[in-house]
A protein has these predicted regions:
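Periplasmic plug
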Residues: 177-225, 238-245
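Short, acidic Ser/Thr/Gly-rich low-complexity loop/linker segments typical of extracellular
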Residues: 60-76
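Short Pro-Gly-centered beta-turn/loop motif in secreted/extracellular proteins
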Residues: 50, 78-86, 94
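Short, ordered, surface-exposed loop/turn motifs in non-cytosolic proteins
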Residues: 37, 45-60, 138-140
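Short, acidic, small-residue-rich periplasmic hinge/interaction motif at the N-terminus
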Residues: 22-27, 56-58, 92-94, 111-153, ...
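Primarily recognizes Gram-negative and organellar outer-membrane beta-barrels
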Residues: 64, 198, 221-273, 288-969
Length: 969
């Protein structure tokens, strides 16, 4: 009780101190006159209101800065308490001419309306010519980073994905995940409206670049925060596309058809003879209505293996009624939603070389593996949104969603494990193809085991969910930080069935008496349901600048599983793989009760929160304290022959949170966040039972596991210097886990079998990491030159226990026969990326770039190993526009190198791509484009992963070299 009282006392003192400091800052900025000015900004051509326009007030005659604001959602701005004198207002926004308005405040002025200021495009008409200054590629406004699309040259007919890859500070990984200055993008919007929910591929692969005017990226607040004005800490990074004004007038259609073929040898020639892609988009973007229909199909997507994809989708949104006065984005009724179908089939091939760290480095485990897999997926999903505002004080939001999916997959793999590095002990270079040719005495000396396996899975799942929110404001003024009552409820229900088959054949070179063949068939039906509810009351103080929120939330879930495992016979003379897919008609007689699992898992989490907020012109501060009673229970647990009755656990956690933001100007700000989160180990982890379904990787539960506490601290700084057109972003974070759960590993060097058991690590810094990202962009004064650079660095500390020796009877205890040794792995990573671009108006764009990434890994057990890796590349890109038929020629070439990897993975890849296009028809509406990727057929894909117990290098085989011919209309 004393500890809780101390926390509460510190909480109140800190908030009181900050509140006093905020009042001090506010007085320094407060104007002391009696005149108020107001105005509104709109687009000169369309008369649409413009939000986030920078409004700066300067005093005459010395042009000293007095005050600055930005326009609200309705385009309005207000500056209060001006002194008598002469001033001028300056309105500025990316892509528009700066507007200056002179004004004079005299003694009797109280309210002085400026009127409507019309913002013109950043172009000046002289006779029949247009002189247009090139716009800066990036600009910061508040927390929003904006990209001017015209500053980035892409081939005609390109889609959003082609453009985003070239934006400074943006990275797209092999899975399509987008990061902007280290922040992961979770949603794409069009003119502020959701576009196909969280399915980013619908936007990335379908929206043509030629309709986009600007891309904004910012942290979008949750529905709860947007309708209540109360921060709940739930934000997501989004890309918001602004459509060109002349594209708002009617229907927009775009068609793209392409054919091609792979060049050179590849590992998928039997399945893929030719390449194709097709895309049809139909869009209508208006002020209050959006409609999109997309269809595309292709088998030329780059990534792991080869993939055939087909997508169909419809998206719509509609604002009904007139917006409420001075609330541009608040309509009486807003409806929207989407439905989409995704179908794909893929083939993949990968190889890996891994090392498991053991307590004696001379007997480390080295494993080579090759796997091939096939996957088929089909899904239909959709979500909707209904937002109803009977008046300005009441908002009701309902979001339903559903999904139905069917998938099947199959894979085959082969592996071999050695007790020493095979590249040093033998002359082999293609281990998996050559190890069987080794003399028996050598294989029995350095070989540990080999495994061949085949797996297949058939899955189906159905899901339905909904979220309902209602918020009542008791203060109808524009400031939403008033008294507020809100209720939030959600539910979800999903179920399905998974049928899997697995067959494995193990040979142990040191213990041939343990050679085994296993053939198993699993049926696993699931039924899950979740419900949650939250109620929050917010009470304002000090004219709404300070508020106190009290909330209660309950979350309940129930998961039912009933996995049935059948051990199929392995007898007689047969070809192992031929019988793998055979399922006996009398399946029930092979049911194995020891390997089957039946359980009902129930959780109930309660959250009681108190949050104090303080908002001023420059400072936003929030401090909260959460009390979380948590219940977890498992009923009717049956597994591996054990029958366990009701098992439950109750834990109460206390987690603080602090959020601080300081804003010097609308373009310069600092944000600091600290959060703590608790998590419970799963009930499966806590059960003292052993699972040997994979004979080489056996797992065992630990009933003594304790909950973990994760602490995170993050810092974000952003600044845009308008005079020199420089953008600076800095992100830093520190995270650690108290009582973190790591796997204790027992490794048997005779058989290569590993037994893992989860356990809590002691100490505050047993598992922690820190990272930082700094990015810089600059456009030079004549706007022909621009540069961008980014630096990232990270450190990670991981701990786990390991033991080498005979495992013995693992059903009785894990790790018997010797003491475990602490294995610590520390990883330092650093990277630098830079590019320089020259653009001569619309004719030539030339870019040179380079990057280097370094990873240093040290392990306390494997002290003699060099695990440093280097990845570096350098090259350039050129785009040339010719006056004849709007012809474009583009080419890029990069040398990509790897060092420090296993075997043949160290290599230099010279990657050269080229494309050419020309336009036809009226208005250049038709485009013919030819593309040649990886002309030298030299690209390869390799990555490394490191943990506290081992490292692994993996190579994925792809079709990288191919030609495509497009016709786009």
């Amino acid at each position: 009780m004393n500890r809780r009282f101390q926390l509460l006392t510190i909480f109140v003192l800190l908030v009181s101190l900050l509140s006093a400091q905020n009042n001090k800052v506010e007085k320094q900025q407060r104007l002391t006159g009696r005149a108020n000015i107001s105005g509104k900004t709109v687009d000169y051509t369309t008369d649409e209101v413009m939000s986030q326009v920078a409004v700066q007030l300067f005093a005459l005659p010395d042009s000293s800065f007095v005050y600055g604001v930005t326009t609200d959602d309705g385009g309005w701005f207000n500056i209060k308490k001006l002194n008598v004198g002469k001033y001028y207002l300056r309105m500025s926004f990316l892509g528009y001419q700066t507007q200056d308005v002179n004004l004079e405040i005299v003694k009797d002025d109280r309210e002085k309306p400026i009127g409507v200021i019309k913002m013109q495009d950043d172009a000046i008409m002289l006779s029949e010519a247009v002189i247009q200054e090139a716009l800066p590629p990036t600009q910061m406004v508040e927390d929003t980073l904006m990209y001017n699309v015209d500053a980035f040259k892409v081939p005609d007919g390109s889609v959003l994905e082609d453009l985003v890859k070239r934006l400074p500070g943006v990275e797209i990984d092999e899975n399509g995940a987008i990061k902007v200055n280290g922040q992961t993008v979770t949603r794409i919007l069009v003119d502020g409206q959701e576009y196909f929910g969280n399915d980013q591929n619908m936007a990335m692969k379908n929206i043509p670049v030629n309709i986009i005017d600007r891309i904004k990226t910012y942290r979008r607040k949750s529905d709860f925060t947007r309708i209540t004005g109360v921060e709940d800490g739930e934000e997501e990074t989004v890309l918001d596309l602004r459509v060109k004004k002349n594209m708002h007038k009617g229907w927009l259609s775009n068609y793209d058809a392409a054919l091609g073929y792979p060049v050179g040898e590849n590992d998928f020639s039997e399945w893929l003879k030719a390449l194709y892609s097709g895309r049809v988009t139909l869009n209508r973007f208006q002020a209050n209505t959006q409609f999109s229909m997309n269809a595309n199909t292709n088998n030329s997507g780059r990534g792991g293996g080869v993939r055939k994809n087909t997508q169909l989708g419809v998206n719509f949104s509609k604002n009904i009624g007139e917006p409420y006065p001075r609330r541009r984005n608040e309509f009486p009724l807003v409806v929207g939603g989407n439905i989409r179908w995704n179908g794909s089939s893929s083939r993949s091939l990968s190889e890996s070389e891994s090392e498991t760290f053991t307590t004696e480095y001379t007997s480390s485990s080295f494993r080579n593996n090759r796997s091939r897999s096939n996957n088929e997926n089909n899904s239909v999903s959709g979500d909707g949104r209904i937002e109803w505002r009977p008046d300005t004080s009441l908002t009701i939001v309902f979001r339903p969603s559903f999904s139905v999916s069917r998938s099947n997959s199959s894979s085959r793999s082969g592996s071999v494990t050695f007790n020493t590095d095979p590249y040093q002990a033998t002359d082999m270079r293609d281990i998996l193809n050559e190890y069987m040719n080794l003399p028996a005495e050598i294989l029995d000396s350095i070989g540990v085991n080999s495994q061949n396996s085949a797996n297949s899975n058939d899955n189906n799942s159905n899901q339905i969910s909904g979220n309902f929110q209602i918020s009542k404001r008791f203060n109808k003024e524009r400031n939403s930080n008033g008294r507020n009552l809100s209720v939030d409820m959600s539910f979800s229900k999903n179920g399905g069935e998974s049928i899997s088959r697995s067959a494995t054949k193990q040979e142990y070179y040191q213990r041939h008496d343990r050679d085994t063949i296993m053939n198993r068939y699993n049926v696993n039906p699931t039924d899950n349901s979740n419900m949650s509810g939250r109620i929050m009351w917010t009470e304002p103080f000090d004219s709404g600048r300070t508020s106190l929120s009290l909330s209660y939330q309950i979350q309940a879930s129930k998961r039912e599983t009933n996995r049935q495992t059948y051990v199929l016979p392995v007898t007689g003379d047969y070809e192992f793989w031929d019988q793998h897919w055979y399922v006996p008609s009398e399946l029930q007689q092979y049911l194995n009760g020891e390997l089957s699992r039946q359980a009902t898992n129930v959780t109930r989490n309660h959250t009681i929160s108190m949050t104090l907020r303080r908002n001023t012109e420059k400072i936003n501060f929030q401090m909260g304290l959460n009390i979380l009673p948590q219940y977890t229970g498992m009923d009717n647990f049956k597994y591996m022959g054990y029958e366990i009755g009701d098992t439950s656990r109750v834990v109460v956690n206390y987690t603080p949170s602090i959020s601080f933001r300081y804003r010097w100007t609308r373009q310069k700000s600092l944000r600091i966040n600290m959060n703590s989160r608790t998590s419970q180990p799963s009930m499966e982890q806590m059960m003292d039972i052993t699972d040997d379904s994979n004979p080489l990787n056996i797992s065992k539960g630990n009933p003594g596991l304790l909950p973990t506490l994760n602490n995170s601290l993050s810092l974000e700084f952003s600044n845009y210097i308008e005079e020199s057109r420089q953008t600076i972003n800095l992100n830093m974070s520190l995270s650690n886990t108290l009582r973190s759960i790591s796997n204790k590993t027992d490794y048997d060097p005779e058989t290569g079998v590993s037994l893992t058991q989860p356990m809590n690590m002691d100490g505050f810094w047993t598992n922690w990491n820190t990272n930082g990202n700094f990015s810089y962009q600059k456009t030079f004064k004549n706007t022909k030159y621009r540069m961008s650079a980014s630096t990232n660095a990270s450190f990670r500390h991981q701990e786990a226990y390991m033991r080498t020796g005979s495992i013995g009877n693992y059903n009785e205890s894990a790790g018997t026969g010797g003491a475990a040794v602490l294995s610590t792995t520390e990883t330092v990573s650093a990277g630098q990326r830079a590019s320089f671009t020259y653009r001569d108006n619309e004719w030539v764009e030339l870019t040179v770039n380079g990057n280097i990434n370094f990873n240093h890994n040290e392990n306390s057990v494997r002290k003699d190993g060099n695990m440093d890796t280097y990845n570096f590349s350098y090259g350039g890109r050129v785009n040339v526009t010719l006056p004849w038929k709007n012809a474009h020629i583009a080419s890029d070439i990069n040398m990509s190198s790897r060092r420090g990897y296993s075997g043949s993975y160290n290599r230099d890849d010279l990657i050269w791509n080229a494309s050419a296009s020309m336009s036809f028809f009226r208005g250049n509406s038709g485009t013919l484009r030819i593309e040649y990727f990886d002309i030298l057929n030299d690209e390869s894909n390799v990555n490394r992963s490191v943990s506290a117990t081992g490292r692994s290098d993996t190579r994925n085989y792809n079709i990288n070299s191919y030609i495509m011919v497009h016709f786009i209309y």
